Amino acid sequence: MAALTAEHFVALQSLLKASSKDVVRQLCQESFSSSCLDSESLLDKTCSSLSVPQGEAAQLLQALHHFTRLVAFRDLSSAEAILALFPENFHQNLKNLLTKIIVEHISTWRAEAQANQISLPRLVDLDWRVDIKTSSDNISRMAVPTCLLQMKIQEDPSLCGEKPSISAVTMELSKETLDTMLDGLGRIRDQLSAVANK
């Protein structure tokens, strides 16, 4: 994640216009979420609570969002580590207040960030059935055993929105394909065991 720039710290100085520490605390909490950058209501609320124009409020929200995300990304949970991010000439009381607020909320923010990260689909259920597949033509009649494998897969909830996030995939496997698949899965299991034992 990109480091903070001088412009970010200049924008953070707008918090000095807040009427109370609670206003600063509320803005820090609301600016952590990724949706804050597109929220017109939060922008309007920031303008009115700090008595600043929209451009300045937008820069402040972006700087606060970037700052809180950077702290969570780097897993900085001590006041000393957070204070070290500020430039020397930054307002001392504001620096201490922001650090205190971040230390109070960092564990919640990290949990929120981890819960909202995009992940790969996960296998939630597996079922199979062995069938005899028959085919015939004028020359011969064949009976071939096949495996019908059904996997239930859960998509990342953040990508699905309102739609159900579990889908089923059914595939037909011949004995040869199943042997190849089991051999590959056996090698994967061995590699996982080797990594786990290190």
Curated annotation (Swiss-Prot):
Record's keyword annotation contains Ion transport: yes
Sequence similarity: Belongs to the COMM domain-containing protein 9 family.
CDD domains in the record: Commd9
Family matches, as Pfam families: COMM_domain, COMMD9_HN
Residue positions where N-acetylalanine is found in the record: A2
GO biological process, alphabetically ordered: cholesterol homeostasis; sodium ion transport
Alphabetical keyword list: Acetylation, Cytoplasmic vesicle, Ion transport, Nucleus, Sodium, Sodium transport, Transcription, Transcription regulation, Transport, Ubl conjugation pathway
Gene Ontology cellular component terms for the protein in this record: cytoplasmic vesicle; cytosol; Golgi apparatus; nucleoplasm
Localization (cell): Nucleus; Cytoplasmic vesicle
Record-annotated COMM domain positions: 122-196
Name this protein carries in UniProt: COMM domain-containing protein 9
InterPro entries registered for this protein in UniProt: COMM, COMMD9, COMMD9_N
Role: Scaffold protein in the commander complex that is essential for endosomal recycling of transmembrane cargos; the commander complex is composed of the CCC subcomplex and the retriever subcomplex. May modulate activity of cullin-RING E3 ubiquitin ligase (CRL) complexes. May down-regulate activation of NF-kappa-B. Modulates Na(+) transport in epithelial cells by regulation of apical cell surface expression of amiloride-sensitive sodium channel (ENaC) subunits.
Coiled-coil portions: none
